[in-house]
Amino acid sequence: LLGLAFGLAGNLFAYLLSLAKKKVASLLPNPYYRVLLGSVVLTCLLLILWKGRYTGLGTNLIALSVGGGTIYPLDWLLKLLLTVFTLSLGFQGGEVTPLFAIGASLGAVLAPVLGLPIPLVAGLGYLSVFGSSTNTLLAPIFIGVEVFGPANAVPYAIAMAFAYLINHKTCLLYTSPSPR
């Protein structure tokens, strides 16, 4: 169940990013205006929404998620939407760590609902949203073992397998189709 939820979130990110890049480029074909106008809108949004909680890579959300801090139910979605908007404007970099933050915060939201340990489910989200968005299976499992330790390698593999199965061959990082 968790792997499917994280897989859907990863697919949502990859799909929305592809769609938003096309839409923003068609609305603002001049890249200079796109960055200028988009930056003004983005800055206002980031300041209005919890005074910068969603700025940067999202390491603050990761730390709060796995460390038992306060995570709000929409943290993952707001981080996802703001990251998609930022990247669609033409800003480069910052895809991987925000995916970790989106997954970890979604995991921190889902864990109490399912009666599961928050750090474990945040870790599952951390790797599964990334894996689904990038159409990778093994690398996220190894990342989970490296970052969170080997004790939960089996849950990492199970969650990642389900996230990978519903990927629909979308891939955030590459434009060539999956060899599957």
Give the label of every model feature segment:
Residues 97-99, 131-142:
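Proline/glycine-anchored alpha-helix kink/cap motifs
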Residues 119, 149-159:
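Loop-to-transmembrane alpha-helix initiation sites
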Residues 15-23, 140, 161, 165:
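Membrane-spanning helices that line or support transport/gating and their immediate boundary helices
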Residues 174-179:
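Conserved small/polar residues in nucleotide/adenosyl-binding loops
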Residues 6-13, 17:
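A conserved active-site cap/scaffold subdomain adjacent to cofactor or substrate pockets
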Residues 19-108:
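Helix-loop-helix hairpins and the membrane-proximal interhelical loops
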Residues 76-81, 116-129, 141:
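Alpha-helical transmembrane segments of multi-pass membrane proteins
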